[in-house]
C-alpha cells in the first residue's frame, strides 16, 4: 500500500501500491505521475519552495515556505491523490496530520 502522510510543512510518500506486477501497476503510475508533475511545476515557479529527499520506497517533500501559487499546486496534488485513494482504497491511503 502507498501511504501519503500529510503534515503542515511536509508530505511523505512511502510504500508500493501492489495493484499489479512491477512495470504494469497503474495505481503506482498514477501516484508517481501526479507527484512528479506537481514537483516540476512547483520548481518552475520557485525552486526554493520545496526540498525533495528521496530514499528507497520513500519520498519526502519538505515545504520551506508557503506561496499562494505553489500552495495551489500542492493542494491540487493532494486532491488528485485523494481521488486515487478513493478509487483504490486497498492500494493508497492518505494520512492527514496537518495542523
Language model regions located:
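N-terminal intrinsically disordered, cationic/polar leader segments
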Residues: 1-26, 35-36, 40-99
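Gly/Ser/Thr-rich active-site loops/lids in small-molecule metabolic enzymes
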Residues: 31-33
Amino acid at each position: 500500500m502507498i501511504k501519503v502522510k500529510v503534515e503542515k510543512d511536509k508530505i511523505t510518500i512511502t510504500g508500493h501500491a501492489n495493484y499489479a506486477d512491477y512495470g504494469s501497476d497503474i495505481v503506482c503510475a498514477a501516484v508517481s505521475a501526479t507527484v512528479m508533475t506537481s514537483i516540476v511545476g512547483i520548481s518552475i515557479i520557485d525552486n526554493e519552495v520545496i526540498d525533495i529527499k528521496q530514499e528507497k520506497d520513500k519520498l519526502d517533500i519538505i515545504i520551506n515556505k508557503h506561496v499562494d501559487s505553489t500552495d495551489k499546486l500542492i493542494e491540487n496534488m493532494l486532491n488528485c491523490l485523494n481521488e486515487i485513494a478513493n478509487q483504490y482504497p486497498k492500494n493508497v491511503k492518505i494520512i492527514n496530520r496537518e495542523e
